[in-house]
Amino acid sequence: MREIRYETPIEDVDFNIKTVFLAGPTVRGNQPHLTSWRNDAVDAFRQLNFDGNLIIPEFTDRRESDQFRYDIPVWEFNGLQGSHVIMFWIPRTRDLIGLTTNHEHGYWMAREREKMVYGRPNDAYRMTYLDIMWVEDAKRRSKELKVYIRCPIYTTLESTVKASLALLNIDHI
């Protein structure tokens, strides 16, 4: 498994290899009291023997800040665009609010929903809106396309990772 972080130029990523983007709230450099959920996600992918690219939109040094780094949103957009699966895990809290995550979730749901997996813990803060939009968008698409569009909302990180790998394997058959 290749771990790709902000220090890796996104143009160096081989998107011909199975690629998963870990989307969700990011611990910022000014939040040293918080721990990134992505550490557990990386461990879960490793335990399941994932052998592709894992895009981790964070710095290797957790004290690093993205403040005034206007290249970071472009890096993330290119990573999201090139990935085969966008795994949204949203363990939202009052400290880890995920405002950019809200935008990304809506944008990619409208643009390429079929490559999204959506999960969040049952106790995540203020998730009702995203949950409702996820389900209502699936209903609308199902009606328009006359085909059932799945809309599971996973409630554990492990089940979200497994669903991402399942989607990735379907996509590459």
Question: What is the meaning of each model-derived region?
Answer:
Residues 1-173:
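Conserved catalytic or regulatory cores that recognize and/or transform ribose-phosphate-containing ligands
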